[in-house]
């Protein structure tokens, strides 16, 4: 087993999409799958590509094709000033249009952000509380997100809960909630992987923030849904 750090080696877990930079562990540090299901980054890029699906004129949903395990959707947001990715695809696809900034909801889905950062000279940012986790250490972050901020029309809100640095975003009438909540058999549940009480408390914070917002669409980790339908499920969850 090669465990020696080497920045030229990168492996992708085909079960969860996690990228391992410079090391080849026996098991995936994110999902625990054995290294028999790993691909080199080059192999991954030859077998998978990243497809963009329009959400609206400013937002594009990014997914690996064919589906790369548990990989979550990333979203490209085009503002008047810059382009942003919210989270990052696991597959490194050089054919994608350049992006100025990669900002994360949390550290579970850093994808191939190190490679896109190098290819596009993108600035990569995450909440500092999630940058210190063990699985984040091989990734490069150019700066840390402030707790709450507004930048080029993108509103960011630090919630904690699912992870210490979890941050959700709103751009115009689109809510980017990632995997804070799951839709399972037409019902909504909180993400079960994290502190239960803090995640529930974060749900109340989210509700306080979004209640007076003019939201039409919700972009989740594997779905895009109209806000009224999503909010009805969310209200049942938090009440």
Model-derived regions, located:
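Active-site HxH/HxHxD metal-binding segment of metal-dependent hydrolases
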Residues: 89-152, 236
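Short, solvent-exposed secondary-structure boundary motifs
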Residues: 58-70, 130-131, 146, 158-160
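Metallo-beta-lactamase
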Residues: 5-26, 34-37, 83-84, 132, ...
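Active-site-proximal loop/helix segment associated with metal-binding centers of metalloenzymes
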Residues: 65-72, 128-130, 134-139, 184-194
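Short, flexible loop segments at the rims of nucleotide/cofactor-binding pockets, characterized by
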Residues: 61-66, 82-88, 101-104, 153-159, ...
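Conserved beta-strand hairpin/beta-sheet module of binuclear metal-dependent hydrolase folds
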Residues: 47-92, 167-182
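Short Cys/His-rich micro-motifs in 6-15 aa windows
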Residues: 31-44
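Active-site- or DNA-interface-adjacent structural scaffold in DNA-acting proteins
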Residues: 24-29, 137
